[in-house]
């Protein structure tokens, strides 16, 4: 099981196929998605990688967060998330995951927070039919009607579908096909809609219900950071030449 990535939703557009058909796609941007920490079986009881994405000013991070980012030698991140992985699929701390982590044609599962709709009635929130347009009904055409039973049980059961807050919940959409990747610009285009508004954070993982293509990189596609020693060695080699 490989790591996923933290991406940012840019919006929707369409891509034309060679046959002239157009596909509605959602464009996701993978930018500065780096490994911040590891979770190991000995220390934490499970194996995972903690990723960070986006940029945040140091003054807007607390002392504990600054220490965590300093140990990983990465810039402060706006979004953090963990992804469970196999023990042999750990990506080095500080490595930056790139858009070619996913290959064209593979399926992914995306997780995001849906757009909040505020307080909504039963017809909009749960697709209720409402009451009759006439024949004794006045004013309450869009109400949900009775919510309880008779004298027994004499109550409304918990989890009854009723008017209330709609949206702003975490939702996972499964089996979206990767249509295009652009490593230079850090873009991933997936077929279909992705939950959330433009600019929202999206967790992208390999689909659990589809087979991973053999050409998918393992443990992933990433760029290792340049250490001070490597930079100094390159400078020495250039001077010697």
From Swiss-Prot:
Methylated by PrmB. Keywords: Methylation, Ribonucleoprotein, Ribosomal protein, RNA-binding, rRNA-binding. One of its GO terms (cellular component) is cytosolic large ribosomal subunit. The gene is rplC. This is Large ribosomal subunit protein uL3. One of its GO terms (molecular function) is rRNA binding. The lineage of its organism: Bacteria, Pseudomonadati, Pseudomonadota, Alphaproteobacteria, Hyphomicrobiales. One of the primary rRNA binding proteins, it binds directly near the 3'-end of the 23S rRNA, where it nucleates assembly of the 50S subunit. Residues 140-168 are annotated as: Disordered. It comes from the Bacteria. Part of the 50S ribosomal subunit. Forms a cluster with proteins L14 and L19. It comes from Azorhizobium caulinodans (strain ATCC 43989 / DSM 5975 / JCM 20966 / LMG 6465 / NBRC 14845 / NCIMB 13405 / ORS 571). The keyword RNA-binding applies. InterPro entries: Ribosomal_uL3, Ribosomal_uL3_bac/org-type, Ribosomal_uL3_CS, Transl_B-barrel_sf. Belongs to the universal ribosomal protein uL3 family. The modification N5-methylglutamine is found at residue 151. GO terms for biological process: translation.
């Amino acid at each position: 099981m490989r790591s996923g990535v933290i991406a940012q939703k840019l919006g929707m557009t369409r891509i034309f196929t060679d046959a002239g058909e157009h596909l509605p796609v959602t464009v996701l941007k993978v930018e500065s998605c780096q490994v911040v920490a590891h979770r190991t079986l000995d220390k934490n009881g499970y194996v995972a990688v903690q990723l960070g994405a986006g940029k945040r000013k140091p003054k807007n991070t607390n002392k504990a967060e600054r220490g965590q980012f300093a140990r990983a030698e990465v810039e402060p991140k706006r979004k953090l998330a963990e992804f469970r992985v196999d023990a042999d699929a750990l990506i080095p701390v500080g490595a930056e995951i790139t858009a070619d982590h996913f290959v064209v044609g593979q399926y992914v599962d995306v997780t995001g927070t849906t757009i909040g709709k505020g307080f909504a009635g039963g017809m909009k929130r749960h697709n209720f039919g409402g009451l009759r347009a006439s024949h004794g009904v006045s004013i309450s055409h869009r109400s949900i009607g009775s919510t309880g039973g008779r004298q027994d049980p004499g109550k409304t059961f918990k989890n009854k579908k009723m008017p209330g807050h709609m949206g702003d919940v975490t939702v996972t959409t499964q089996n979206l096909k990767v249509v295009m990747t652009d490593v230079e610009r850090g873009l991933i285009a997936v077929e279909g809609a992705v939950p959330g508004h433009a600019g929202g954070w999206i967790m992208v993982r390999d689909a659990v219900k589809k087979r991973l293509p053999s050409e998918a990189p393992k443990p992933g596609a990433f760029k290792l950071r340049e250490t001070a020693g490597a930079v100094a060695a390159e400078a020495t080699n250039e001077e010697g030449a």
